[in-house]
Amino acid sequence: MLELLLQWYRRRFTDPQVIALLVILLAGFCILYFFSGILAPLLAAIVLAYLLEWPTARLQRIGCSRPWAASIVLVIFSGITLLAVFVVAPTVWQQGNNLISDMPKMLNKFNAFAQTLPSRYPALVDAGIVDMMAENLRSKLSGMGESVVKISLASLIGLLTLAIYLILVPLMLFFLLKDKEQMLNAVRRILPRNRGLAGQVWLEMNQQITNYIRGKVLEMVIVGIATYLVFFVMGMNYALLLAVLVGFSVLIPYIGAVIVTIPVVLVALFQWGVGADFWTLFIAYLVVQGLDGNLLVPVLFSEAVNLHPLVIILSVIIFGGMWGFWGVFFAIPLATLVKAVIHAWPEEFIPDAD
């Protein structure tokens, strides 16, 4: 038995390339785990660099130098971003304030509706449970004002941090696009020599991350616009705010769609009650979600490695718990990394590719 264990260990853990891969993965994990907060601007710049690499490379192919291509792409991207912010942000902010001010009315209406449930469905709903839920919601709402004040005070520091990020991220993004090859060569020089296996995993992961980031941004935009059109046509309150939330919800696979459905349903109930308009909007909303999951995602992520839904959910929970927002955003690529490492892990010695 001991001999079998020793043979298994020699096959899988004595290869210099395996040791190099383990060192690289461990170093990357420690850096992200302990310094993810400090590195947030760099991570944001890397994500945007993946997104903008394609148009930059296209401009290079038609004759632009790399610095000029990076500059043109960055200027166009900044213009589109500023336009979207100045058009969308004021309306979203106003609708958010209106939603907060309407919360007491929504709670009272929901409470009145819930009080009728025990008499309408006595076998299914208990009056005591309804009262307990209503009291719990009321206590949560009463503490909302205090929470908003705390958030407002904390946001002063957040605004300063945001201002710094608005300077750092574009600068980092420009140099990541402009000096891509020089930076990759610098990274290669500090990596272990026996990195053939790590290079094999990186080639697969680099393409996966590229496809994932581009696909996820497109999915956010398409789902957000489609949802807004549905809400706007139906005349739903807070249409733009809710559509933006639905668009961002695609960042969290499965879980995000469930969470964002709650405010959509509550606002629709408050506005129309359980009537024809409510059911029309709810069905249209489900159609958008269904088209996203069954049509849009397969098209945008056709080149991604297939992962079981349970694996994706666990990845969101685990990596989100370790790295917060970035762990959630990169949950699928990180799960794919684990899968790629397992598949590439050698049982026999692999000659160094360098």
Predicted regions and their residues:
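Membrane-interface starts of transmembrane alpha-helices
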Residues: 65-73, 126, 130-133, 195-199, ...
